[in-house]
Design a protein with these regions (language model features):
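Short acidic/polar mixed-charge low-complexity motifs
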Residues: 33, 158, 209-211
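Short Pro/Gly-enriched beta-strand edge/turn motifs at strand-loop
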Residues: 12-14, 183-190
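Conserved beta-loop-beta element that borders a ligand/cofactor-binding pocket
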Residues: 88-90, 160-165
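A short glycine-threonine-serine/GTX helix/turn-capping micro-motif
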Residues: 126-137, 159-161, 192-196, 200-202, ...
């Protein structure tokens, strides 16, 4: 919702009746309106259905089957509003053996294979906070799908369901690595590839004051500038792309 609201959409959050409003403290709630509804009551269900009748889209994040049991599933709401784009966000997808399982970002990026690529050589994988599953593979993928669905509905008059699973999104985020592996340009070991800290010109280094600096000098002109500024005059640094020399450099 934050991404859509930030780009000008009118976003209304349907909150549980009596719940605390975190909009003033939660950055993810910015630019969103808020209403309360008791989804266990006929009145609450009717209120949501009425709201959806004039909406471009709706987003829900319950476990699979919950919205259907509430009487707010896609068949019902698209019956009320055929142009509605119905967004669904789950960890594992609507179907399959894990669809009803609980999970967090770390679980989704593990199953997708994404987590395998993060970390130093000969060490365990290091989760990159919850940026990959929850936000990149989840929220951003769904917001893109919602925009695409709404644009399609405006030209065709037909709504649709956007089924977004964080596991699927996390796998897509790593598409470049999967492609490189298929081409033989990426090794299936952490910390031995150019973009995962193996290369001396693409890594982080501790400074004298205890802070850290990131270096990303892939292109020849930037690598030459790095050598000039860092005083790397040893001829050994000439062979920038010689992977066999990276560990010693």
């Amino acid at each position: 919702g934050m991404m859509l609201a930030d780009h000008g959409a009118r976003v209304i959050r349907v909150a549980r009746q009596g719940s605390r409003d975190a909009a003033g403290r939660d950055v993810l709630s910015r630019n969103r309106e808020r209403i309360e509804a008791d989804l266990k009551s006929p009145e609450g269900i009717a209120a949501v259905r009425e709201l959806a009748k004039t909406a471009d889209g709706i987003i829900e994040g319950f476990r699979p089957g919950v919205m259907e049991r509430l009487g707010l599933g896609p068949d019902v709401l698209l019956g009320d509003n055929p142009k509605l784009v119905y967004g669904r966000m789950t960890g594992w997808g609507q179907y399959g053996p894990l669809s009803q399982a609980a999970g967090h970002d770390i679980n989704y990026i593990s199953i997708s294979g994404n987590l395998h690529g993060y970390g130093r050589p000969n060490e365990k994988p290091t989760p990159p906070t919850n940026a990959i599953g929850d936000f990149a593979g989840g929220g951003m993928m769904l917001s893109f799908g919602m925009v695409a669905g709404i644009l399609n509905a405006r030209s065709t008059g037909k709504g649709q369901v956007i089924d977004c699973a964080m596991t699927d999104g996390a796998a897509v985020i790593h598409a470049m690595q999967w492609g490189f592996r298929g081409m033989g340009a990426w090794e299936d070991t952490r910390g031995v590839n150019m973009l995962d800290t193996a290369a001396h010109f693409y890594d982080t280094y501790e400074c004298a004051d205890g802070t850290f600096i990131s270096i990303g000098s892939i292109e020849p002109q930037f690598y030459a500038l790095l050598r000039e500024k860092a005083g790397l005059t040893d001829p050994a640094f000439d062979a920038q792309m010689d992977k066999s020399a990276w560990p010693s450099l």
